[in-house]
C-alpha cells in the first residue's frame, strides 16, 4: 500500500503520467468537463471532498510550475482562495496566471484530466501546470 496521502488510483495514475507543461484541473462540482478530457470524479455529496483538501493532496505528489485561476474567484472570494493565496506565497504552486471564467473553461480542453470535487462554493477551480523535479 502507498505511504503517501493520495490513495485514489485514477488520480495517482494521472499525476504519475504528467509531463512538463501538462495541465491538471481541480474543479468545483459545477465545472463542465469538455468531451474527450478525462474526468476523475471524487464528488460524494455537496462539500465532500472540498476544494482545498483535494488541492493539498494533489500537491503532495505533483510538482507545479504555475497555476491558473479565474478572476471571478477573487470577486466571489471562496474560502479556498485563502489557502491558494497561502500556497502561492510559499511558492508551492509557482507563478500565477489569471483569466476570465469563460477562458478558464476553454483552457480545460487542454487538460490531461479534470478532478471534480464536491465543492459548491462558486469559482473554486484551479489549473495546475506540471513542472519538473530537476
Curated annotation (Swiss-Prot):
What this protein catalyses is:
beta-D-ribopyranose = beta-D-ribofuranose
EC number(s) per UniProt? 5.4.99.62
Q: Which Pfam families match?
A: RbsD_FucU
Pathway given for this chain reads: Carbohydrate metabolism; D-ribose degradation; D-ribose 5-phosphate from beta-D-ribopyranose: step 1/2
Please tell me where substrate binds in this chain: 28, 101, 123-125
Keywords, ordered alphabetically? Carbohydrate metabolism, Cytoplasm, Isomerase
* Swiss-Prot/TrEMBL GO biological process terms: D-ribose catabolic process
Q: Where in the cell is it found?
A: Cytoplasm
Q: What class of enzyme is it?
A: isomerase
Q: Does the keyword Isomerase apply?
A: yes
Q: Name one GO cellular component term.
A: cytosol
Query: GO molecular function terms here?
Result: D-ribose pyranase activity; intramolecular lyase activity; monosaccharide binding
The positions flagged as active site in the entry are 20 (proton donor)
What does the similarity note say?
A: Belongs to the RbsD / FucU family. RbsD subfamily.
Functionally, this protein is described as follows: Catalyzes the interconversion of beta-pyran and beta-furan forms of D-ribose.
Q: How does it assemble?
A: Homodecamer.
This chain's protein is named: D-ribose pyranase
Organism lineage reads as:
Bacteria, Pseudomonadati, Pseudomonadota, Gammaproteobacteria, Pseudomonadales
GN (gene name): rbsD
Amino acid at each position: 500500500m502507498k505511504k503517501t496521502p493520495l490513495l485514489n488510483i485514477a488520480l495517482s495514475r494521472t499525476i504519475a503520467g504528467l509531463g512538463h507543461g501538462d495541465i491538471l484541473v481541480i474543479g468545483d462540482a459545477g465545472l463542465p468537463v469538455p468531451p474527450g478530457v478525462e474526468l476523475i470524479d471524487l464528488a460524494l455529496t455537496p462539500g465532500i471532498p472540498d476544494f482545498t483538501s483535494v488541492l493539498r493532496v494533489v500537491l503532495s505528489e505533483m510538482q507545479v510550475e504555475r497555476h491558473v485561476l479565474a478572476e471571478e474567484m477573487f470577486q466571489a472570494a471562496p474560502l479556498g482562495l485563502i489557502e491558494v493565496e497561502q500556497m502561492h506565497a510559499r511558492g508551492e504552486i509557482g507563478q500565477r496566471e489569471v483569466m476570465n471564467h469563460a477562458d478558464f473553461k476553454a483552457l480545460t480542453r487542454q487538460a490531461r484530466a479534470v478532478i471534480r470535487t464536491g465543492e459548491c462554493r462558486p469559482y473554486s477551480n484551479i489549473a495546475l501546470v506540471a513542472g519538473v523535479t530537476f
